[in-house]
């Protein structure tokens, strides 16, 4: 045995071996300690593990038929630790000649990481587990901002290559994530704590084995896996926000005792409230009694001193091994509590064509100052199980549960320049003072069972994943209180009053005082399977075929309550007094009677719906290594998609049922210019489908937009043609420079449009005739050790410079909607 030092205690040597040219895992590679019979062979994932190695320093011999033998020197094994070797092997020019290459383990591991990127079938960027550990990132939404070409909207939705949530798709551990939003195709990435992630990749070009419903990025989230050795970790971090930490005056709703755990135990519609059908026929007396059942909780609470932001995580894993089999279990929990205050200003232009044509002094125009107070709590847990039977069979069962609670209070004040009458006010400029209270809670469970098998004789690989995701999102008691006063003239300010209390109110609208409650439930079982078969074609080839099936089922229910009055019994003198009262007392019990205020339920049939969709897909993909330098990955995917929405419009049932089948080809070409340069070309056709609410011809109030949104049953799915070029240069180990121009052509893209309304802003959806997205991404990763030679220091030896730049131009042609040409 060749060793520099040896002790009585033992460790392990493990890692993964891949083909240097293709990045493919190599099966059956011999890994031995030089001069001994101690060793192991790689399994069907290219992984190996040598147990019971005495602590010391060794030379490791790696050999495989038709590949150059490699000897790694200076491999240090420490007691009770695993030395990780990620190794690439190069094909021998003559199969029977032995060629020995000697290298150091540190360089070898760095090269293996870059080789995986260099030989990736698609253009992809990602974040590793090591980087995630070094950052203060709290959720997956924070992590994704570190990926080239990606950003986050509203602190939770992914934007990739300038394309929003509609054009991105998220998978976790190989299975799709259900949408967390009621009216859009989007997954709220802040639901998954960063502490439970192993890695995250964003694939930007399509291949036939990937779902077709994306054009920006295919987000692949992987939770923690079973490590090669037993591990137990605990992490705690604290942070400060300059506008909240240890500050007074933070506004929030009346919190429940469980808010700190991310769910509500207090808010919601009280027991005793009539069902919607009963409320529609209720008398004023019944409505008054019902209004008094609700808490008078319109006053924001104040905090004397806000605690720092805090994050905590803990994980543990255990591996059990017999002579031929392995079993592992990993558990992790993560918790975070975050406060944020955001002040901003909004200028809202006139809404109608008539108003926009007016002179500024006579047109409606609004300017608002916002104060947004937000507390967000995330709690998540992971339980992952894995089992390996022999070297050719592996099973895993991964589970993730998260719950998130977000308490948000928005205070808004400003001026509306008006030229038309409104109830109880004069035709002068108006000062607004509004309060919006929103507590949103979300719960998600997602589980994936995966099996992987390798048939030694034929070298066929089989992989399948059964997935299930369930999401619950509720808004138990969204409240809005709107005050309005005439503009101050000199030292005189007209009394404030509650704005627009409409005696004929029959729907929840953006400019009225009231409350709103909603509940969304969605489940999404799925199945994916694929078979990879080597074929004798060109220098080396493989054909992969398989299928994908997914069923989404959703229910959404909402109830609306508006404060109103009885026009025949209203006492104006009492109204003028009550209108001066603050949020704590304006809707107190003494003001709830027939001559003043009460709540009327204005829930419409269109405020609730049930929906489902079904995808059945199959694909075939060829991976041809035509020459040593030229590789082509090509094939096609067929998807049949059925979508159904059931709801109720005014006086009638609405039932939409549509089925579409698409054939979607793709081609990826990789040409190796030199040993350290690649040139890539990619073409693919993908698509984007309307979401449930978008193509249902219903009008509904959307809290997040504070607007009425109207669906459109004439919408069709959009087709997208994607073209990518990429030049990659790898100057040395752990360094890369890349330039990636891309172009996308959209046919019939679904766009949100403004529906003119003189009172408040409405939205709907329409297929534009076409759109284009063109841009370039530049990414660099450079070691700074060269600066030490210039400066005569050793300051930069462990420093790396990362940088990325994305220049993107998008243009949408809206001529078929009569809206002209719009650019963004």
How should each PLM-predicted stretch be described?
Residues 76, 105-159, 165, 174-192, ...:
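Periplasmic N-terminal accessory/gating domains of Gram-negative outer-membrane beta-barrel systems
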Residues 404-406, 509-518, 530-674:
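Signature of Gram-negative outer-membrane beta-barrel scaffolds
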Residues 289, 293-410, 667:
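Transmembrane beta-barrel wall of Gram-negative outer-membrane proteins
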Residues 18-22, 29-34, 63-65, 78-133, ...:
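Short, acidic, small-residue-rich periplasmic hinge/interaction motif at the N-terminus
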Residues 742-745, 764-824:
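Gram-negative outer-membrane beta-barrel transporters
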Residues 426-450, 603-616, 687-746, 756-787:
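Outer-membrane beta-barrel signature, preferentially recognizing the C-terminal barrel domain
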Residues 226-231, 321-328, 392, 456-461, ...:
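Short loop/turn motifs that connect adjacent beta-strands in outer-membrane beta-barrel proteins
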Residues 36-47:
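Short, acidic Ser/Thr/Gly-rich low-complexity loop/linker segments typical of extracellular
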